């Protein structure tokens, strides 16, 4: 049966009911392991370093954390997106190259919700995979170490061609992408703190400032 949407989420629910045709997506690791799931977000192909995050909440903070630039993030918690997109961002934009989840909630419920993860990923051209065993994937990464991988919707992928590309891939200098381009100052009456921005989250400066510090970024 249909569940009545929370107030203010009518448009979100209408979009989700329309949905889109489910498309297969594949996560190919450089060790030859292949995980098959459903495409979420953008359908473009991407090669990236694969890392995992064990947070039970705060998926939006993870998506907007500059320290994940140049990486595709695996969320180990099984259900992601149940409260939608809220204003709780750690920067002005999302940074991961890809997003990998066990199950993506397409009907969020939260009075602060401004959209869905699916919409957010599509808008920011971030490809992802849902419906795979993220804990099995995390176990591989934990035992073998961080490795490169490819997210693709191409069902005719060729492992013999892809694996050498994955092994040769490097993330490059991501600091240039995430650092601020000009000095910022958060006024305070206490100690003066210099925050070097090599991908600093908004909450670091905010927390220092809330404790009375004048923060120069």
Regions of interest found by a model, annotated:
Residues 1-16:
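Single conserved hydrophobic/aromatic residue that forms the stacking wall/gate
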Residues 22-217:
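RNA-binding accessory domains that recognize and position tRNA/RNA substrates
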């Amino acid at each position: 049966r249909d569940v009545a949407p929370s107030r203010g989420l009518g448009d979100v629910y209408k979009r989700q009911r329309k949905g889109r045709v489910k498309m297969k997506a594949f996560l190919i690791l450089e060790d030859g392991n292949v995980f098959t799931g459903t495409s979420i977000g953008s359908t473009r192909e991407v090669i990236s370093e694969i890392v995992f995050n064990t947070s039970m909440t705060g998926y939006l903070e993870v998506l907007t954390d500059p320290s994940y630039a140049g990486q595709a993030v695996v969320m180990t918690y099984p259900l992601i997106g149940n409260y939608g997109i809220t204003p709780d961002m750690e920067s002005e934009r999302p940074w991961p190259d890809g997003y990998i989840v066990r199950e993506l909630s397409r009907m969020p419920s939260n009075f602060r919700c401004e959209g869905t993860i699916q919409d957010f990923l599509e808008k920011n051209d971030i490809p992802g995979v849902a419906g795979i065993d993220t804990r099995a994937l995390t176990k591989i990464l934990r035992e073998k170490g961080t490795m490169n991988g490819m997210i693709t919707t191409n069902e005719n992928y060729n492992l013999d061609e892809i694996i050498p590309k994955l092994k040769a891939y490097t993330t490059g200098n991501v600091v240039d992408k995430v650092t601020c381009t000009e000095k910022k100052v958060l006024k305070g009456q206490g100690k003066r703190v210099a925050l070097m921005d090599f991908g600093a989250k908004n909450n670091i400066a905010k927390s220092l400032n809330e404790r009375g510090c004048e923060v120069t970024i």
